[in-house]
Curated annotation (Swiss-Prot):
Its main location: secreted. The modification Phenylalanine amide is found at F36. It comes from Olivierus martensii. Residues 1-23 form the signal peptide. This is Peptide BmKn1. Belongs to the non-disulfide-bridged peptide (NDBP) superfamily. Short antimicrobial peptide (group 4) family. GO terms for cellular component: extracellular region; membrane; other organism cell membrane. Amphipathic and cationic peptide with an alpha-helical structure. The lineage of its organism: Eukaryota, Metazoa, Ecdysozoa, Arthropoda, Chelicerata. Keywords: Amidation, Antibiotic, Antimicrobial, Cleavage on pair of basic residues, Membrane, Secreted, Signal, Target cell membrane, Target membrane.
């Protein structure tokens, strides 16, 4: 009975360690993406990179309104 209890306790501690390390790795990856600024590593606003000289301000406003709920 002692070995089963020890094994269960060991597995619970191992599961907690794995979940904590996953959160830590995710936080480090988020920090690195902010530091290096890779576009593929973070969600970028689609309107930020939209530039076409043939579009007027009214066209851009209409596009932004259409993309609000997208």
């Amino acid at each position: 009975m002692k070995s089963q209890t020890f094994f269960l306790l060991f597995l619970v501690v191992l599961l907690l360690a794995i979940s904590q390390s996953e959160a830590f790795i995710g936080a480090v990856a988020g920090l690195l993406s902010k530091i290096f600024g890779k576009r593929s590593m973070r969600d970028m606003d689609t309107m930020k990179y939209l530039y076409d000289p043939s579009l007027s301000a009214a066209d851009l406003k209409t596009l932004q309104k259409l993309m609000e709920n997208y």
